[in-house]
Amino acid sequence: MTIRTQLAGLLLIAGTLLPLNLRAAQTTPTALDKSIDLSVGDHVKVHQILTQLQQAVAQHNAAGVAVLVHYPIKVNPGKKPFTIKNEKEFIKDYDRIITHDIADAIFKQKYETLFVNSQGAMIGDGEVWITGFCRDKSCKQSDIKIGTIQDTKNLEP
C-alpha cells in the first residue's frame, strides 16, 4: 500500500467521522449555552444574531444591522449619547453608530468567549449587548435583539 493510498484512506475515515463530531458538539449544550438560555432566552438565537451582525457589519449593510436592534435604543458611539427610534433612523445614522472601534469589537468577538450576565450577552468590552426583551407584560413572548451599542472607551467608570 502506497503512502498516497494510506493518506486517501485516512482522509476518507476523517471525513466520515468529522460530521458526527460536529453534530455532537452542536447539540450538546455547553455551560455558556446554558448561561445564555437562562439569562437571555435562547443560545441558538444569540449565536445567529452574533453571526448575522458580524456579516452585516463586514458588508457595511446598515439595514442588515438595523433589523437586529430593539427600538428605541439609546446609543453612545462617541461623547454624546442619542436615541434611535426605529430602523429608518438607524440606517440613516449607521456610520455615526457603528464606529471603527465598535465594528472592530464585533469582528473580534467569538461566540465561545461571550460574557453573559443578567443584562445579556456582551460583545467586546461592552460595545454591544444582545438582550432578551419581553413582548408583553406577562413576558410569555420575548425577542432577542441588540439592546446596547456604545463606545466603551468614552465611558466614565
Positions of predicted regions on the chain:
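Bacterial N-terminal signal peptides that target proteins for export
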Residues: 1-10
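Bacterial N-terminal signal peptides
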Residues: 9-19
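Sec/Tat signal peptide C-region and signal peptidase I cleavage site
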Residues: 20-24
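C-terminal-biased regions
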Residues: 25-55, 66-157
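Charged, alpha-helical scaffolding/interaction elements associated with membrane systems
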Residues: 58-59
